[in-house]
Amino acid sequence: MIKLLLTDLDGTLTEDRGTYVVDIGAIKALRRAEKAGIRVALVSGNSYPVLRGLHNYLGLSGGLVAENGCFVFHGGVTFRVCETVPREVVSEFAKTFNLRESWQNEFRRSDFGFTPAELKDEMIKWAEERGLVVQSSGYALHLSGKPGGKGAGVRKLLELANVKREETGAIGDSRTDIEMFREAGITAAVSNADPELKRVASISLKLKSGAGVMEFIDMLLS
């Protein structure tokens, strides 16, 4: 019995990859899951304010993991999981590799976004030399304080929610969701997901993005 459903945001709850437009059918499916007793949690590289607002307005009860695992919200309390990245280091990274900072960086503390999203070996070396983590979601580069990655945040959320791995479902589209999938008992990759994610998923869905969310929730509720 699945008690908690973890869902990514961009490319998963949206109408497609590469758009910010949320799929209305997917949102209705999340509400059906909640009404059936499955708590829904948002797990994303997005900033805490964005996810907290969505969590509230969509009527979700499972909490959230923001900034790629660096912040967790559950039961009205927010927890920091990752180390803080100094603002001057963020600016140095952008300048060194000629990157554009995300508009959300103003509201971030431990995980910062940049475009273009292409990850290069010299970026990884630069981050490692400073005790940081850098990864690409396919939408943006993310520079994070350690431990970085969705896995640490999801583990904290499951602990707070008192939910076991086998009682947890997860759905996503990006290689950055692999860590989240490792913490869930049943996992689903939408049809337009990264190949790396499909290889580790329990289920490869027939439908893309938001339509895939509807497909997966139908499976869970059947």
From Swiss-Prot:
Keywords: Carbohydrate metabolism, Hydrolase, Magnesium, Metal-binding
Residues annotated as signal peptide: none
Residues where substrate binds: K150
One GO term describing the cellular component: cytosol
Classification via CDD domains: HAD_Pase (cd07514)
HAMAP family: GPH_hydrolase_arch
Record family assignment: Belongs to the archaeal SPP-like hydrolase family.
Record-given protein name: Phosphoglycolate phosphatase
